[in-house]
């Protein structure tokens, strides 16, 4: 009987220990989780307020033929608008909507090339009119504008306007960000903010703080800013808060910080953006005093200390 009693007591202690040890929520180190793949070329095309057309990498087809403008999708994840008539009247509008975990390349009817980043939207005429070329941007895009002195090119982004003749530049104007930024790689643009005009030369970056209304023009590494369109992350002395916003758009995850101080830590590094999320976070954690853990689609960033 004494042995039976001891066994019963031990069983009770074991189950009590199990109950105390049961976790309420389990966060798994990123290196141990199922890999989260990077983004890829994909978008939605809406023409003349019609039905949305899904665009995916690997498909090659004619999407539409509207009043002499042929719309072609190629297999590499791009779309081009071919103006076969060369007419001067503007015909309808199209929008290319790129979701999180996406990117897309578009050639407009005048030959202008546009790389559209994730979580962004570009609206433009199917064919430009005779006086101006005007597009609207939400989010981020890199432009290589076909030169035409007769038709200035404008990018409308929120309350700002970029005026171009023929040049290569990047515009970042995400609605949820606190700033709008224009970075000029080559050529010349003017950045119009309300009643002020800022003229940029290559290598300059104009940043509008949308909260204070202040605009700052500075020299910077524009090549690093536009590296995203060449398939690379290039983080130059970037805060973890800003860095994780970029990662969240590309990988479709949410980042949360265990400590406000962690947001201010800075990171520099460059890598391909087509690696899995765990690879990218592992590279960051090796050179920064932070760890990453994931539950479902939420990544928690914590200090190692």
Question: Where does each model-flagged region fall?
Answer:
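Sec-dependent signal peptide hydrophobic core
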Residues: 5-8
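A residue-level detector for the "anchor" residue at the start of short, highly conserved motifs
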Residues: 2-3, 14-305
């Amino acid at each position: 009987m004494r042995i039976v009693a001891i066994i019963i007591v031990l069983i009770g202690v074991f189950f009590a220990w199990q109950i105390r040890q049961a976790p309420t929520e389990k966060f798994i180190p990123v290196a141990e989780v199922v890999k989260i793949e990077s983004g890829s070329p994909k978008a939605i095309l809406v023409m003349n307020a019609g039905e949305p057309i899904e665009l995916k990498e690997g498909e090659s087809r004619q999407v539409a033929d509207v009043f002499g403008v042929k719309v072609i999708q190629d297999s590499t994840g791009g779309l081009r608008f071919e103006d076969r008539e060369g007419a001067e009247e503007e015909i309808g509008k199209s929008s290319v909507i790129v979701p999180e975990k996406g990117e897309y390349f578009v050639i407009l009817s005048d030959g202008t090339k546009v790389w559209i980043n994730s979580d962004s939207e570009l609206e433009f005429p199917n064919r430009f009119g005779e006086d101006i070329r005007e597009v609207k941007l939400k989010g981020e895009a890199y432009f290589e504008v076909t030169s035409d002195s007769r038709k200035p090119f404008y990018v409308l982004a929120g309350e700002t306007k970029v005026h171009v003749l023929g040049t290569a530049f990047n515009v970042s104007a995400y609605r949820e960000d606190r700033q709008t930024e224009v970075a000029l790689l080559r050529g010349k643009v003017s950045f119009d903010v309300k009643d002020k005009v800022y003229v940029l030369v290559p290598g300059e970056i104009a940043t509008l703080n949308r909260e204070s209304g202040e605009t700052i023009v500075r020299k910077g590494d524009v090549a690093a800013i536009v590296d995203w369109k060449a398939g690379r992350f290039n983080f130059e002395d970037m805060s973890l808060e800003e860095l994780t916003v970029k990662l969240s758009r590309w990988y479709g995850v949410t980042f949360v910080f265990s400590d406000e101080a962690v947001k201010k830590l800075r990171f520099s590094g460059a890598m391909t953006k087509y690696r899995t999320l765990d690879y990218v976070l592992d590279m960051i954690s090796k050179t920064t005093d932070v760890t990453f853990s994931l539950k479902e689609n939420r990544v928690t960033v914590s200090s190692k200390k």
